[in-house]
Amino acid sequence: LERKKDFKLKYERVDLNGLLDKIVEQQSIKSSKPFHVGLESMPDRIILEADRTHLYNILSNILDNAIKYSGDSPHIQITAEERNGSVIIRITDNGIGIEEEHLAHIFDKFYRVSNSKRPPVRGYGIGLFYVKTMIHMHNGTIRVESQPGKGSCFIITLPQTHERQEIDIIG
């Protein structure tokens, strides 16, 4: 992780609805506990230009965290909308939430929230760092709203189109 690597984003047209269906299906196969995901308030089809592999990993990582940090019966709501040339995706869970003092750091490399009130969750603290890095490379933004004991909502905003070219990334 300390070495710099060259990446290339390969933009292509991505059907967000189909991608989300695939992510939910894959999570249901790999998850050790049952969960419910609602894909509501979404247009029939949202198309955006993105690197399909990285977008899959971004959304899968956030959904995986929502499941891990939501106790025995996770309920996750995913919504998406098109607005002013952007796509806004919200992933909301009914999990343990994130305390205010941690919100500014959860996207930092290797940052882990310590909480003695819950059993430890496996991880290295790089998932959300990767998520934020890749979203920024797509010229997008991510933010989180959270209340301890009530859950979290991750809000991703991505441009709907990009110039048709490969973009070099050094990270």
What annotation goes with each model-predicted range?
Residues 98-110:
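Short conserved segment of the HATPase_c
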Residues 73-85:
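Short beta-strand/loop element within the Bergerat-fold HATPase_c
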Residues 4-9, 45-50:
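Conserved micro-motifs of the catalytic ATP-binding
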Residues 10-25:
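A conserved beta-strand-to-alpha-helix junction within the catalytic ATP-binding
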Residues 30-39:
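Short conserved segments within the C-terminal catalytic ATPase subdomain
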Residues 66-67:
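Short helix-loop "hinge" at the ATP-lid/N-box region of the Bergerat-fold HATPase_c
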